[in-house]
C-alpha cells in the first residue's frame, strides 16, 4: 500500500507552510484564491486524504470487477489466472469483494458491454491484459465507474495503468545472455499484437545495438497470430542462433518443446530465456531463466489506485511501472571461447 500523503508533503512541494496548506484545504481565510486552487490541485494529484475522511472511506466495502479476455484463459495460460488471484487476495484484504468476467473474442469484436458493467454490479473495474482500443473506448463511455488497466497500457484510451517494466526487463535479460558469451540471439514474439510484446522486443533490440549487433528478420519469430491466439508449436529458423529471448515463459516452454522435437538440447545446444518467472509446475522439464514480474507489487498499486478513485480522492491518470527481477535457473549455457 502506498504511503499516506500528509499536509507537510504538499507544503514541501510548494515551498509554503503547513498552516497555509491547512487553511487552503479547510476553506479558511488567509490564502489567496490562486494559491488555494494550486494547493487543492496538487493535493488531488498527490492523493491526499483528509484525516477522518480517510478512516470513514477505508471502512467502506466496494465491489471490484475484473475483466479478462478469453484468449488469456487458453490451455496452460496460467500467468493471468495467477495475477487475478493476487489482485483478488489484495482487494479482499482491503475490504473489497471481487468478481471476474471472461470476455469472449466475439464479444470483444462486437463491442458487447460486459455483464458486470451492464448490471451495475461494481464500483470499479480492473481490465486485466490488453484489449482492442475500440473495446476500451466503449468501456470508457459505458462504464460509469473508475477503471484501471493491469499489465498493459493504451495510448488511444488512457486510464490508470499498472505494468511491469517490459522494456528494461528484456533489455536486462538479453544483456545477461551477452554476459554468457552469446552473440547470435533471436527474439520470439509476434510484434504489434500487444504493446507488452513490442516493448519487450525494443528492450531486446536496445541490448543488441549496444553490443554492435543489428536485429535480423530471420531471428524475429512469431508465437501467435494477429488475433493473439498462441501457436502450439514454434517454427524454428533455418539458420539457428545460440540463444532465444522469449516474450513470456509460456512461449519459452513451447519453444523448448519444438527444439527438442528437432533434436536440440536446452541448454547444451541452445539457450532459452523467458519473461514472467511464472509457469505451471510440470509444464516444462527445463527450469527457465526469466525476468520475473512482481505480481504482488502490481496488485497493491492497482487496488490502491482503484480505491482512491472509487473514494473520489484521485482524478488524474498515470502510468505505474513496476520493476521486476532476474530469475537465473537452468536454461542458459555459458559459451566459452
Go through the PLM ranges and name each one.
Residues 93-94, 208-215, 238-239, 261-266:
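Short helix-capping segments at alpha-helix termini
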Residues 231-337:
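Flexible loop/turn connectors
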Residues 1-2, 59-175, 234-239:
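Alpha-helical recognition/docking segments in bacterial nutrient-uptake
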Residues 17, 49, 123, 182-185, ...:
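Short acidic/polar active-site loop segments enriched in Thr and Asp
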Residues 69-82, 100-108, 162-172, 188-231, ...:
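Hinge/beta->alpha junction and helix N-cap segments in small-molecule ligand-binding domains
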Residues 1-60, 336:
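N-terminal helix-turn-helix DNA-binding module of bacterial transcription factors
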Amino acid at each position: 500500500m502506498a504511503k499516506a500523503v500528509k499536509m507537510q508533503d504538499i507544503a514541501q512541494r510548494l515551498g509554503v507552510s503547513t498552516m497555509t496548506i491547512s487553511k487552503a484545504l479547510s476553506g479558511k481565510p488567509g490564502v489567496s484564491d490562486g494559491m488555494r486552487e494550486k494547493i487543492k490541485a496538487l493535493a488531488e494529484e498527490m492523493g491526499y486524504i483528509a484525516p477522518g475522511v480517510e478512516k470513514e472511506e477505508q471502512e467502506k466495502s466496494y465491489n471490484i470487477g475484473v475483466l479478462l479476455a478469453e484468449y488469456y484463459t487458453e490451455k496452460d495460460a496460467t500467468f493471468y489466472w495467477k495475477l487475478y488471484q493476487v489482485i483478488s487476495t489484495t482487494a479482499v484484504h482491503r475490504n473489497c469483494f471481487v468478481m471476474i468476467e471472461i470476455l469472449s473474442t466475439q464479444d470483444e469484436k462486437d463491442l458487447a458491454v460486459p455483464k458486470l458493467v451492464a448490471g451495475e454490479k461494481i464500483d470499479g473495474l480492473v481490465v486485466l491484459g490488453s484489449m482492442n482500443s475500440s473495446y476500451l473506448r466503449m468501456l470508457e463511455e459505458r462504464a460509469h465507474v473508475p477503471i484501471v488497466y493491469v499489465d498493459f497500457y493504451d495510448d488511444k484510451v488512457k486510464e490508470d495503468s499498472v505494468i511491469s517494466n517490459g522494456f528494461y526487463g528484456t533489455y536486462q535479460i538479453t544483456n545477461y545472455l551477452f554476459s554468457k558469451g552469446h552473440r547470435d540471439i533471436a527474439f520470439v514474439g509476434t510484434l504489434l499484437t500487444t504493446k507488452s510484446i513490442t516493448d519487450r522486443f525494443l528492450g531486446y533490440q536496445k541490448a543488441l545495438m549496444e553490443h554492435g549487433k543489428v536485429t535480423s528478420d530471420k531471428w524475429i519469430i512469431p508465437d501467435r497470430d494477429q488475433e493473439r491466439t498462441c501457436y502450439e508449436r514454434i517454427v524454428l529458423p533455418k539458420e539457428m542462433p545460440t540463444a532465444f529471448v522469449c516474450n513470456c515463459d509460456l512461449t519459452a516452454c513451447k519453444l523448448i518443446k519444438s527444439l527438442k522435437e528437432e533434436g536440440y538440447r536446452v541448454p547444451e545446444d541452445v539457450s532459452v530465456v523467458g519473461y514472467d518467472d511464472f509457469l505451471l509446475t510440470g509444464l516444462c522439464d527445463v527450469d527457465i531463466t526469466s525476468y520475473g514480474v512482481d505480481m504482488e507489487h502490481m496488485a497493491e498499486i492497482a487496488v490502491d489506485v482503484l480505491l482512491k478513485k472509487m473514494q473520489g480522492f484521485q482524478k488524474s491518470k498515470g502510468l505505474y511501472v513496476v520493476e521486476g527481477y532476474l530469475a537465473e535457473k537452468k536454461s542458459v549455457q555459458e559459451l566459452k571461447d
